[in-house]
Amino acid sequence: MAPQMSQKEADIAMMLAAGCHLGTKNVDFQMERYVWKRRADGIHIINLGRTWDKLMLAARIIVACENPQDVICQAARPYGQRAVLKFAQYTGAKAIAGRHTPGTYTNQKDAIFAEPRVLIVTDPRTDAQPISETAYVNLPTIAFCDTDSPLKNVDVAIPANNKAKHSIGCLYYLLARMVLQMRGTVSAANPWDVMVDLFFYRDPEELEAKEEEAAAAAAAPAESAGYNAVADAAYGAESWDEQKPAEAFPTGGFAPAAGNWSEAPAPTGWDAQQGGDFGSGFGAMPPQGY
């Protein structure tokens, strides 16, 4: 029997399955410390042991905030928007999925002005605007950084693949679970009853196509049942197989006539004459030589 894996080993195995260790062909000089090795095709492999340690550090920072609403997580990349919303749902943080409005953290006259205590971003490149704004207000920033990501104004860099949908979903799932375990909401002895699949990005067009197929499959039996009900009402509930075929000839023979044919009443019409010479009923014929 194989020995049971520890929590760290199980998390690293999950990150390996999600592809969190796959970097890019380019490496930023500040991200070299997190690179384990370089493959033959040029892809750099990220050390997931360092990734897990940084996830624990980020979870401690988030738990230190007394009010969960003081934590804002952002994702301008489409693959990270669902993961951000799910993270906010389970941890109580605020989520900004989509385009960032400039001045959200610096313009006090803005209607959506916010003063969070911690900011979490999915990609330092696509989320460069909120990171630059946090530098003006001394806001701690946590970012998922790939091997080519710039670390300017990033306080806690979590090295991982931030371009794949499965990798982003897995990272936010692990971070949310760590936060809940440190708060005491989820027990470390028992596994979290939320599946990691809920954090993965889903294509809206693919979901719409699946819903249409399911609706069509559900409507087909209903239409067939309705047609059968109309047919039964019009032609009877009996099936065609239950109907007995009509007999070609009566099996009991023909019944005898009620009486003699000669006893029938004599006709009274113009064709009532019977027998005799032709024309006898038209009077005397003229002589032949007339």
UniProtKB/Swiss-Prot annotation:
Keywords: Cytoplasm, Ribonucleoprotein, Ribosomal protein. Its main location: cytoplasm. It comes from the Eukaryota. It is found in: Cytoplasm. Pfam families: 40S_SA_C (PF16122), Ribosomal_S2 (PF00318). One of its GO terms (cellular component) is cytosolic small ribosomal subunit. GO terms for molecular function: structural constituent of ribosome. GO terms for biological process: ribosomal small subunit assembly; translation. InterPro entries: Ribosomal_uS2, Ribosomal_uS2_C, Ribosomal_uS2_CS, Ribosomal_uS2_euk, Ribosomal_uS2_euk/arc, Ribosomal_uS2_flav_dom_sf. The keyword NADP does not apply. Residues 266-290 are annotated as: Disordered. HAMAP family: Ribosomal_S2_euk. Required for the assembly and/or stability of the 40S ribosomal subunit. Required for the processing of the 20S rRNA-precursor to mature 18S rRNA in a late step of the maturation of 40S ribosomal subunits. Belongs to the universal ribosomal protein uS2 family. Component of the small ribosomal subunit. Mature ribosomes consist of a small (40S) and a large (60S) subunit. The 40S subunit contains about 33 different proteins and 1 molecule of RNA (18S). The 60S subunit contains about 49 different proteins and 3 molecules of RNA (25S, 5.8S and 5S). Interacts with ribosomal protein S21. This is Small ribosomal subunit protein uS2. It comes from Ostreococcus lucimarinus (strain CCE9901). The lineage of its organism: Eukaryota, Viridiplantae, Chlorophyta, Mamiellophyceae, Mamiellales.
